[in-house]
Regions:
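Transmembrane beta-barrel strands of outer-membrane/channel proteins
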Residues: 37-45, 74-80, 123-129, 184-188, ...
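Repeated loop/turn-to-beta-strand initiation elements of outer-membrane beta-barrel proteins
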Residues: 35, 70-74, 119-123, 179-184, ...
Length: 361
């Protein structure tokens, strides 16, 4: 796997192409958007400081977009994960958002994207991961933990298509202005990571999952400023529950606020909070909230320091994850990110550490 990562990075750096973003609505009419790609690799060392155990996790993502007729694009994305060691912590909320079973190749994104009405309305049909579109506000990306990538009330109560799984679905977006985004998605109720199952759409057997959100984002005055984001999202799921041998419907919501606070010289300060709740007899997670304090541009090269507090409530447990992390860019393509987590799971405490290197092309 290590040689695969190096070979992919080497091949990408030796080939020039304009990367306009596979899911950018503005790219559909631009001449340079006829063909574009992206490639990213993450390698992470992990250490359970309470037990002394160590681990190593790796993730490789690649995407490709090909312009077709006006406003239409064919999109594809693959994912590879490699973890030669066992998991080092038994926690409810995973401390690393790249932990996944070993699989050299997953097709996680494949379908047709079509834009209408001057790119204000977008429709995608095909394979897709929910965390491409939801739970991905700017400050959520500061954390290395899994809960900020998908709230536990959604991730733990459904077999949903978030990393590393995918599902067949219909995704619709509407952007009446650059600040407002309304989106909703209907997925197959069971997500998979193998090609022979991923393209299934079986509402009678697997049920369905619907996610949606309405958000308003106000960009900062400069490119490196924190942006303000206000979001409300919902989920509905109807699936077969093994414990009761019957179909079960659940509904829930989540809300996120990300707010710049002040700027001291070049350093920006911001705060964020998310809350979620699940109704109708959730099987695993009932409620969740988090809070984040962050400061960016701490050095002349950049650098963002974040303190993140996650609190999750389960039917048979409760857990708090406190994370301190610092993401430091090293040139144009590399980012170094150490992180320390303190977990308290129904009174059981442990310390976990990570050192992550990300390469993005």
């Amino acid at each position: 796997m290590a040689s695969l990562l190096l070979a992919a990075i080497s091949a990408a750096t030796s080939t020039y192409a304009s990367n306009t973003g596979a899911n950018s609505a503005d790219s559909t009419d631009a001449p340079t958007a006829r063909f574009d790609y992206s490639l990213s690799a993450i390698t992470e060392g992990q250490w359970n400081m309470t037990t002394g155990r160590g681990a190593w996790a790796n993730r490789l993502d690649a995407s490709l977009g090909i312009g077709l007729w006006r406003g239409a694009r064919l999109e594809a994305g693959i994912l590879s994960t490699w973890q030669p060691t066992d998991y080092i912590a038994e926690v409810c909320q995973d401390f690393s958002n790249i932990n996944a079973p070993n699989r050299p190749l997953r097709l996680v994104h494949f379908g047709l994207q079509q834009h209408f009405i001057d790119n204000k309305l977008g429709v995608f049909v095909g394979l897709r991961q929910a965390d491409e579109d939801y739970f991905n506000t700017p400050m959520a990306g500061l954390s290395t933990g899994a809960s900020c990538g998908c709230v536990p009330t959604v991730n733990d109560n459904f077999h949903i298509n978030v990393f590393p799984l995918t599902a067949l679905g219909l995704h619709i977006t509407y952007t009446p202005t650059p600040q407002w985004l309304v989106q909703t998605t209907l997925y197959n109720g069971n997500a998979y990571d193998t090609l022979d199952r991923s393209f299934r759409f079986r509402p009678h057997a697997d049920g369905v999952i619907n996610l949606g959100s309405v958000s308003y984002t106000r960009e900062g005055a400069h490119a490196d400023d924190f942006s303000a984001t206000y979001l409300v999202g919902w989920n509905f799921g109807n699936h077969y529950r093994e414990a009761t041998q019957h179909r079960h419907s659940q509904v829930g919501f989540w809300a996120t606020v990300e707010q710049p606070l002040a700027k001291v010289g070049r350093v920006g300060l911001a705060a964020a909070a998310t809350v979620s709740h699940q109704f109708e007899d959730p099987e695993v997670a009932v409620g969740y909230w988090n809070g984040t304090l962050a400061a960016n541009n701490l050095t002349r090269r950049g650098g963002t320091l974040a303190l993140v507090l996650n609190r999750a409530y389960y039917n048979d447990a409760h857990e708090t994850d406190t994370e301190l992390t610092f993401a430091m860019p090293l040139g144009q393509y590399f980012t170094l990110q150490p992180a320390i987590h303190h977990y308290s799971t129904s009174g059981h405490k442990q310390w976990l550490g990570q050192l992550r290197v990300t390469v993005s092309l």
